[in-house]
Amino acid sequence: MISIILMGCHSYVLDDAQFDLRHSFTEADYQHSEELLKKFKKKNIYRSKDQVLYNLESGMIYHFSNKFDSSSYYFTNAENEIDQNYTKSVSRGIGAFLTNDNKLVYDGEPYEDLYLNAFKALNFMPLQDWEAALVETRRMTYKMEQLDIKIKGLASAFAKSDSSGKADWKTDDINIQNSALAHYLSTILYAKAGDFDDARIEREKLEIALKEQSTLTPYRNSNTSNFEILQKPSSYNVLLAGFTGRAPYKVQEDARVFIDDYDDEKDKEFY
C-alpha cells in the first residue's frame, strides 16, 4: 500500500512539472524550458517509464531553440522507445488501475509518433540535408499506412461485436494513410533535391489528401491552384510552416471502487 501511495504522489509531481514546462513553452521562453528540463532530469522527475515523454519534450524544445542536431537526437530516442514499448504488460495495466495511467510506461500516442518524424524532417531542412529529411517523410507515410490498417481492423472488429446496430462503423470514405503534411514536405524536398518527377507525384498526392481531409473536418476545401510553385524551388526562398493549437487535453478522473470480498460461509468455517 505504501508503494502505491508513493507512485501516486510521483504522478502528481510529474503533472506539476509538466505544467511549468508547458507554460514556459507557451511563452516562447525556450531557454527557461531547457533549464526546467535539466532541473527535472536531475531531480529524477522523469523516471524510466517516462523516457518517451522526456525525449519528446526535449526534441520539441530544442527544435524551437534552433538546436536541430540535439532535437533530432531526442526525437530518435523517443521513436526507439516507442517501438520498444509497443507491447504493454498486464502487470503494468493492473498497476495503472490501482493508481492512475501515470503508472504505465508512456509509449506515446500515434500522432506523436508521426509528428516526431515531421519535426525531424524540418530539422534537416535548415541543414540542407534533403535526403535525410526525405527519409523522415517516408517514415511518416509508412506509419500512416500501418495506422490505417490498424484503425480499419479495429472498426471491423467493433462492427462485428456491436449488437445494437446503431453505430456507423463504415470506413470506406476514410483514408488515414494519406497525410497532407507528409506529401507537402515531400514535394518541397524532392524539388530541392532536383527530383522534379517525384516532386510532381507528391504534389498530386497532396491535392488528393487535402480533398479527402475535407470530408473529416468542417473546414472548406483548400485552394490547390498555386501548389505547382512548390515544384519550382528557385521561385521561392522562404518556407513558412505553422503549427497551432494543442493536442487533446487528457483529464484524470478519480474513482473509488468498493470490492466486497466478504464470504459468509468461510467466516462460519473459521469459527
Label the predicted regions.
Residues 23, 61-62, 123, 189:
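Residue-level signature for tetratricopeptide repeat
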Residues 11, 47-49, 110-111, 170, ...:
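Residue signature of alpha-solenoid helical repeat architecture, marking inter-repeat boundaries
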Residues 157-271:
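Extracytoplasmic/secretory-pathway proteins
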Residues 9-29:
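Bacterial Sec signal peptide processing site at the extreme N-terminus
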Residues 45-51, 81-93, 144-155, 207-227:
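Boundary/linker segments of alpha-helical solenoid repeat arrays
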